Amino acid sequence: MTTIHDHLGRQLVIQPGPQRIISLCPAITETLLELGSKSVVGRTKYCIFPQEIVEDIAVVGGTKTIDEAAIHALNPTLIIAEKEENTKEIVETLAAHYPVFVCQVETVDDAYRLIETLGTLASVQQAAVALIDKIQKTFAQLPALSGNAAYIMWRKPYMAVGKTTYITSLLEMLGFTNPITKLDGRYPAVTIEDLQQAKLDYVLLSSEPFPFSEKHRAEFEPYLANAKIIFVDGEMFWYGARMLKAAHYFNTIQQAFN
């Protein structure tokens, strides 16, 4: 048996060799499968990528509620969770029966660490190293952007991405400044007045979890005359394997910021 520590410093003991992994986070499931892992035996109903592979993997509930019977039936040797995506109660419940590795991703560097960690846990280290290298090189080729940008993810109330979040770290890596980090909380509720005071150059309206679309432009544009309203694909702000697609995505939408 091997003793390891997860991203929260929790100690767990796992068996050596191939694992039977249940992933409770969509970005983690996608990354494991994109790395070529054959170890994933269970996923949440929200783990929908890569589509051609996940449909053959058993569903064990959602990210906030789990089907314990389905999990026990799969006889996993390792469960991988994520601090923000899954609840403490889920982790504690499952940890009474199985090793549960909890990942934590709050920065771009954390995302690279996640890929490396998954490579180790699923015995696909070489693929993980290669993916990290490819992502870093692709991002390095992007022209630097600049300006104040707020990423709006919810409506009624409006909620924005704030401090100590992967999305803010990604925006900063691209060259933006996120003034919402001055507010309390990681995903603070914001008003139009808050956005006005932030002196924004860009308002990024995400496609998820709330599906902002063109019809919502009028809620912002008349009140933020100096800011450009840009609709962005929320899936491109996932961490893990999706970062490679994200780098290409940001390259294709460069003109929207000019």
Question: What does each of the following model-derived ranges do?
Answer:
Residues 1-258:
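N-terminal ligand-binding lobe of clamshell/alpha-beta domains
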